[in-house]
Amino acid sequence: MVDQVNLATEQTSLLYPEVSRKKEELSVNKWTILPALWVGGFLSALDMTIVASLYPVIGSEFKLMNNASYIVTAYLITNTAFQPLYGRLSDIFGRRPTVVFANAAFTLGTFWCGISRSLPELCMARALAGIGGGGLGTMSSIISSDIVSLRERGTWQGITNIVWGIGGSLGGPLGGLIAQRWGWRTAFHFQVPMGILSTILVAWRVRVKPTVRNSNASLLSRIDYLGSFLLVTGITALVVTFNMGGDAFPWVSPVIITLLVSSVLILFAFYWVEKNIAVEPIAPVEILSQPTPLNVCLGNFFNAFCSFVIVYELPLFFETTLLMPSSEAGVRIFPYVISTSVGSLCSGLYMKKTGRYRNLVIAGFFFMLMGIVSFAVLTSFGHRTPLILISLCLAMTGCSYGMNLTSTLIAIISSLAPEEQAVATGLSYLFRATGSVIGISLSQTTTLSILMKQLASNLKDDPDKDDLIRRLRESISIIPNLPKDIQKLVIKSYATAFTWTFALVAIIAFAGFWCSLRIKQFYLHTSVDRS
C-alpha cells in the first residue's frame, strides 16, 4: 500500500511537474509570507492596547476628558466598517496590493496621530489608522487560507493568535511607560518604524494570487461602490449609536432613536443591493443563506461580545469592588490573554491531527457560557470574591475564546468553495468586530444604569447622596478614601451592578452556544488544492 502511494506521488510529479512545483513553492513561501503578515498583526494588537491606556492622558492634555473616548471610537468605526471590504477588494486587485495598502494606511494614520494638534484632528488620524487596521487581521487570514491546507490552517491560526496576544499584552504597559517618560506622542511615533518594516516585508514577500478567476472588465468597474457606501454608512451609524447611547444621549432621545432607525434602514438597503444589484457583491447573500456560514458569523458576534465584556468589565470590578490599583487590575487579566493563545494553538493542533472541528466549536461556546455564568455568581460576593476562582474562570473563558477563534474560522472556510473564502473571512471578521463594539457599549451602559439605581437606593439616608454619586461618576479613585460604612454600601452597589451585567450577558453566551450546535462538520483537505 505504501509503495502504491509512493508510486502515485512519483507519477504525479512526473506527469504534472507544474503541480508538484506549485506545492513545493507554497511549502517554502508560507514560512516567509506568514511571518511578514504577523508583524502587522502584532503592531495592530499592540496599538489597540496602547491607545486604551493612553486616551485618558490625551484627553486631559487637550482638556477634553469627557470626549476622550472618541479617540477609541473613531478607530473602531472605520476598523469595523472596512473589514468586510478587504475580502472582495483583494479578489479584484490582488492580495499584495491590498495588504500593502492596509499596512501603509495604518502606518500613515499612526504617524499622523503623533503630530496631531487637536482632539478632532487626532480622531481623524485614528480613523485613517482604523481603515488600515481593519485589513491587517482580515488579510492575514485570507492569505493564510490561500497558502495553507485546511488541515493545517488551525495550527497556523493558533500561532497567529499567539502573536496577537503578545502584542496585546505588551501594549498597555509599554504605552504607559513610554508616555510617562517621553510623552504620549512618542507612543505613536515609535510604532511608525515597525509599520514601515511591515509594509516593506509584505510588499517584498507576499506573492499570492486570488483563488477567483480574473475578469476582463476594468478593475475599478468591478468594485461594488453602492454596496460599499451603504455598508460603511450603516455600520458607522450603528457603532455611533451604541457608543453614544446611554452616555452622550439617553437611549430614548431623538438623536439615538434616529441613528438606530437610520442604521437599520441603511443596512436593509445594503442587503437589497447585494442581493439584486451588485455584480460582484462584497457580502454575497448566498453565503449567509447557508446554515454553517450564518451560524459561524452569528457565533463570532456573540463570542466577541462576551469576550470584550470580560476584558473591559472585570478590571473595573477589581478596582471598584476589590479596591485594587489599576496596575494590578490589568495584571489580573493575564490568565485570560495567555489562555486565549494556548486555546487557539491547541485547537489548531487538534484539528490538524483529527480533521475535526465541530466538537471544538461546541465545547468552546459551552465553556464560554459556563464562564459568564460563573462571573455572575462570583461578582455577587463583592469584596469577598475569591480571586483564585476568578483567575480559573478567566483561564477557562480565555481558552474557550481562543478555541472559538480558530475553529469557527476553519468551519466557515471548509463549508465554502475556494473562491468564496476571502469574502466569507471578511464577513466573519465584520461580525466579530461589531460584536466587540456593541458588547463594550451595552455592558458599560447596563452597569452604569444599574449602579445609579443601586447607589440611589443604598445611599438614600445619606444627606450628601447626590454629591457622592456625582463624584463617583467622575472618578472611582475616591472609593478607597470613603468612610467605611459608606464604602461598604458603594462596593455593594457596584457588585450588584456587575452581577446583573454578567447575568444579562449570559443570555448572549447562550445564543452563541445555540449557534454552535447548528454548525456542521465538513472535510478538511490536507493540501492547498482542494479539488
Curated annotation (Swiss-Prot):
Topological domain ranges for the Lumenal compartment: 52-225, 274-297, 382-385, 518-531
Protein name as it appears in the record: Multidrug resistance protein fnx1
One Gene Ontology term, aspect cellular component: fungal-type vacuole
Residues on Cytoplasmic side: 1-30, 247-252, 319-360, 407-496
Cellular localization per UniProt: Vacuole membrane
Swiss-Prot/TrEMBL induction comment: By nitrogen starvation.
Lineage, uppermost ranks: Eukaryota, Fungi, Dikarya, Ascomycota, Taphrinomycotina
Bilayer topology annotation: Multi-pass membrane protein
PANTHER family: MAJOR FACILITATOR SUPERFAMILY, VACUOLAR BASIC AMINO ACID TRANSPORTER 4
A Pfam cross-reference name: MFS_1
Superkingdom: Eukaryota
Similarity section: Belongs to the major facilitator superfamily.
Gene3D superfamilies in the cross-refs: MFS general substrate transporter like domains, Multidrug resistance protein D
Function: Efflux transporter. Confers resistance to a variety of toxic compounds.
Positions of transmembrane segments: 31-51, 226-246, 253-273, 298-318, 361-381, 386-406, 497-517
Alphabetized UniProt keyword annotations: Membrane, Stress response, Transmembrane, Transmembrane helix, Transport, Vacuole
One term of GO molecular function: L-asparagine transmembrane transporter activity
Organism: Schizosaccharomyces pombe (strain 972 / ATCC 24843)
Major location (coarse): membrane
GO biological process: asparagine transmembrane import into vacuole; basic amino acid transport; isoleucine transmembrane transport; L-lysine import into vacuole involved in cellular response to nitrogen starvation; transmembrane transport
